[in-house]
Design a protein with these regions (language model features):
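Conserved hydrophobic beta-strand positions in leucine-rich repeat
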Residues: 12-14, 37-39, 60-62, 82-86, ...
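Leucine-rich solenoid repeat scaffolds
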Residues: 198, 203-248
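Eukaryotic tandem repeat interaction scaffolds
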Residues: 111-201
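The feature encodes a structural signal of leucine-rich repeats
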Residues: 24-27, 47-50, 70-73, 94-96, ...
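LRR N-terminal entry segment and analogous cap-like coil->beta motifs
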Residues: 7-46, 81
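Leucine-rich repeat
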Residues: 8, 30-33, 52-57, 76-80, ...
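N-terminal capping/linker segments that flank leucine-rich repeat
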Residues: 1-24, 235-248
Length: 248
């Protein structure tokens, strides 16, 4: 299928969203000047290693396809600094080379049956937002606490039973979505989240709330619906007294 988009030397953006491609036309890989490439919604099952030639890309959208793997060559796209969309595919793992994208700001790998995130995830210190919702994760790597610029972390709908205490080092974190997991508690190491505003814990089998929750200085909203936590606990009472919206 020919690509009916401008192909001049100055072309920097190519939008092939929902074209029913099945495979990526070879001529796409020849456009080495591309900065933005959108391939979402095409039923893609694989990608050519030739993607390595698109070194000027800062945004790549591979969402809503049928990918079971992403080639390791993606790690060579070190100009990929803005957005990488991998959501709604069939990925069980992410390529290890992904962590070479240390300046990437936004990564959406949600809606995949991911069983783990890369163990050295923490080197991706440019990340401001990380989405890995609706997968098969049971925990996070310890290195996640090194994502020093992370502001939003979305982990809804996984199988997470425990979290590393290193998350308490995420000094820029504003929003943490943990709803619909299997958490029975939170580690004390998470007490150091000075900017956390919204914490969603709904639909987790929580046994108790740690006392440090009441001491989070910026917390504005805590969602505890469908957790079994009652309104008569000291943590809930203290948060409510401070003006934090606690949903039960």
């Amino acid at each position: 299928m020919a690509v009916a988009e401008p192909a001049g030397p100055g072309t920097e953006s190519l939008n092939l969203w929902n074209r029913g491609l099945g495979t990526v036309p070879e001529e796409v890989w020849d456009r080495t000047g591309l900065r933005v490439l959108i391939l979402a919604g095409n039923g893609l099952t694989g990608l050519s290693p030739r993607i390595a030639g698109l070194r000027r890309l800062h945004t790549l959208d591979l969402g809503h396809n049928a990918l079971t793997a992403v080639p390791e060559e993606i790690g060579g796209l070190t100009g990929l600094t803005r957005f990488l969309y991998l959501h709604d595919n069939r990925l069980t793992v992410l390529p290890r080379s992904l962590t070479r994208l240390t300046a990437l700001r936004y990564l959406n790998a949600g809606e995949n049956p991911l069983t783990a995130l890369p163990p050295d995830l923490g080197v991706m210190t440019g990340l401001v937002e990380l989405r890995a919702q609706h997968g098969a994760l049971t925990t996070l790597p310890e290195s996640a606490g090194e994502l020093r610029n992370l502001r939003e972390l979305w982990l809804r709908g996984n199988r997470i039973t425990e979290l590393p205490g290193t998350l308490g080092a995420l000094a820029e974190l504003r929003e943490l979505d943990l709803r619909e997991n299997r958490l029975t508690g939170l580690p004390d190491g998470m007490a150091g989240l000075p900017l956390l505003r919204r914490l969603d814990l709904r639909a987790n089998p929580l046994r108790r709330l740690p006392g440090w929750l009441a001491g989070l200085p910026s917390l504005e909203k805590l969602d505890l619906r469908w957790t079994g936590v009652g309104e008569d606990g000291p943590v809930v009472r203290e948060l409510a007294r401070r003006g934090c919206a606690v949903l039960l």
